[in-house]
Amino acid sequence: MFKRVLLKLSGEFLSGPAPDGSAGFGISPDTTAQLARLITDALTGTNVELAIVIGGGNLWRGARNGKGMDAATADYIGMLGTVMNAMALQDAMEAAGQPTRVMTAIQMAAVAEPYIRRRAIRHLEKGRVVIFGGGNGAPFFTTDTTATLRALEIGADVVLMAKNKVDGVYDSDPRKNPDARRLDSLTHIEVVERRLEVMDATALTLCMDKGLPIVVFDLFQPGNLRRLLEGERVGTLIESERRPERLSHDPSSHVPR
């Protein structure tokens, strides 16, 4: 069983799907409440300390929304979006009975605590979920990199990369290859060499250099998060040394990465 974990969430988890099935926009109170209950229920009764980094793609994507804008400014807007998401998730999790703290890399004392590493660890030790917002305080870095950085700073055992309808990493795109197989175990260097889509290169390099494991899994498969927190193997595990590999070939689980 893990002692302390960092859960990386997509901002789109708060929006729900659009009518055409594509990723939605904004924050849906109902969808956010469902996500908060899912996380809270999985955590209840365990002794696992949980920190969360959430993206802001449901509110702002610099490459799309910031065309013609200074790149740093576009990134700062996106970082503010992650704070909005963090506050929405905090409200929903506390309504579900889970004490939380939002800590931001950009100081905004009226709405959240400034990020201080030792204080974040103390919150975790007291059983509070810590939600990190505002990226790492600097432009040109993704929330994947923020998740890796915060995980290393707080001494997390693993980064859990939560996905929706994606149950792990495949050896090829299952949307194009019906014989695609899910890889249960990989090393960091194999992810780099095979150009598998797990996280951005900066984040992956940090994990590889520091030996930080990554798990890619489907958050919305019932029971998955609880099983992970209890130490079971779920999804794809990426670590420094490869364990005996098991390949999954289940047509019902062929979902795109």
UniProtKB/Swiss-Prot annotation:
<feature type="binding site">
    <location>
        <position position="75"/>
    </location>
    <ligand>
        <name>UMP</name>
    </ligand>
</feature>
<dbReference type="InterPro" id="IPR036393">
    <property type="entry name" value="AceGlu_kinase-like_sf"/>
</dbReference>
<dbReference type="InterPro" id="IPR001048">
    <property type="entry name" value="Asp/Glu/Uridylate_kinase"/>
</dbReference>
<comment type="similarity">
    <text>Belongs to the UMP kinase family.</text>
</comment>
<feature type="binding site">
    <location>
        <position position="61"/>
    </location>
    <ligand>
        <name>ATP</name>
    </ligand>
</feature>
<feature type="binding site">
    <location>
        <position position="56"/>
    </location>
    <ligand>
        <name>UMP</name>
    </ligand>
</feature>
<feature type="binding site">
    <location>
        <position position="173"/>
    </location>
    <ligand>
        <name>ATP</name>
    </ligand>
</feature>
<keyword id="KW-0808">Transferase</keyword>
<feature type="region of interest" description="Involved in allosteric activation by GTP">
    <location>
        <begin position="21"/>
        <end position="26"/>
    </location>
</feature>
<dbReference type="GO" id="GO:0005737">
    <property type="term" value="C:cytoplasm"/>
</dbReference>
<dbReference type="GO" id="GO:0044210">
    <property type="term" value="P:'de novo' CTP biosynthetic process"/>
</dbReference>
<dbReference type="GO" id="GO:0033862">
    <property type="term" value="F:UMP kinase activity"/>
</dbReference>
<keyword id="KW-0021">Allosteric enzyme</keyword>
<keyword id="KW-0418">Kinase</keyword>
<dbReference type="InterPro" id="IPR011817">
    <property type="entry name" value="Uridylate_kinase"/>
</dbReference>
<dbReference type="GO" id="GO:0006225">
    <property type="term" value="P:UDP biosynthetic process"/>
</dbReference>
<feature type="binding site">
    <location>
        <position position="164"/>
    </location>
    <ligand>
        <name>ATP</name>
    </ligand>
</feature>
<feature type="binding site">
    <location>
        <position position="57"/>
    </location>
    <ligand>
        <name>ATP</name>
    </ligand>
</feature>
<comment type="pathway">
    <text>Pyrimidine metabolism; CTP biosynthesis via de novo pathway; UDP from UMP (UMPK route): step 1/1.</text>
</comment>
<keyword id="KW-0963">Cytoplasm</keyword>
<keyword id="KW-0665">Pyrimidine biosynthesis</keyword>
<dbReference type="Pfam" id="PF00696">
    <property type="entry name" value="AA_kinase"/>
</dbReference>
<dbReference type="GO" id="GO:0005524">
    <property type="term" value="F:ATP binding"/>
</dbReference>
<comment type="function">
    <text>Catalyzes the reversible phosphorylation of UMP to UDP.</text>
</comment>
<protein>
    <recommendedName>
        <fullName>Uridylate kinase</fullName>
        <ecNumber>2.7.4.22</ecNumber>
    </recommendedName>
</protein>
<keyword id="KW-0067">ATP-binding</keyword>
<feature type="binding site">
    <location>
        <position position="170"/>
    </location>
    <ligand>
        <name>ATP</name>
    </ligand>
</feature>
<dbReference type="InterPro" id="IPR015963">
    <property type="entry name" value="Uridylate_kinase_bac"/>
</dbReference>
<keyword id="KW-0547">Nucleotide-binding</keyword>
<comment type="subunit">
    <text>Homohexamer.</text>
</comment>
<feature type="binding site">
    <location>
        <begin position="136"/>
        <end position="143"/>
    </location>
    <ligand>
        <name>UMP</name>
    </ligand>
</feature>
<feature type="binding site">
    <location>
        <begin position="8"/>
        <end position="11"/>
    </location>
    <ligand>
        <name>ATP</name>
    </ligand>
</feature>
